[in-house]
Amino acid sequence: MSSRSRFDQAFKYARVIPFNDTDKFILFSDCHRGDNSGADDFANNRNTYFHALQQYYKNGFTYCELGDGDELWENLHFSTLYESHQNVYELMRKFYLENRLHLVWGNHDMIYKNPSQVKKNLHSHFDRRTGEERPLFPGIEVHEALILKHEQTGQELFLCHGHQADWMNYVGWRFNRFMVRVLWRPLQGAGISDPTSPAKNYLELIKVERRTKKWIVERNNQFTITGHTHRPRFPEPGDIAYFNDGSCVHPRSITGLEIENGFISLIKWQIATTDDGVLKIVRVLLEGPQKLIDYKTN
């Protein structure tokens, strides 16, 4: 199956979410929540991510996580991730209970393609304090893709992880997972990058972006948002409508895409220092806001 066929299939079976200009969405991906060890790339940005997500929760945003939220290549069990980042999952639970959480699977959490794995890992968790199973995201479904469809204009925003353009991380993901577990994770502490990841392999990153853009053009410039490469992208109207929300494992910040009042913006959250030496977490606008309708082609 070609990358085109994989994208076509994801688009065909995507969950459609109607929205209008009063709705607000925050899109993050590639959190890679791990076990809080030295190999956990998320741990350095956990406080930044948690604060940002709290602000979005308080301000009525819906959270769409576009894959690789859970690092299930390096870690065997979701329970390890929950115990390491319990405050994060409990905040996500609040979103879910208010119907404001949508999850997409990526290559590092591709086991969620299997509904039985979703039920086993996400519907409930074992509470060590009570010795009982406790609901976490009861009944949740994890999708390959989402389509945000505007109720007035009919515009469709296609959201997926983006590894559909990466054969080795879509078809060959089990082999890559094996290599990460037995080889690259132990070497990560020595500063050796995983060459199977497009986020750490520039040539592969370019190939993934090229295949994605080719599919977008073939679909009449279909508005598309992905993650996977960890490289934020925000096109001008009239260019190829390929957006990328970046990742939550940048060295000193997290990036994402906001949709609000019919506009889209690329943002980052980072720790900044005030003039009197106080550290605080701040939101920085990187690109936009740009009207969604400016990208409409059909």
Regions found by a protein language model. Name each.
Residues M1-E65, G69-N298:
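Extended recognition/assembly regions associated with phosphoester-bond processing machinery
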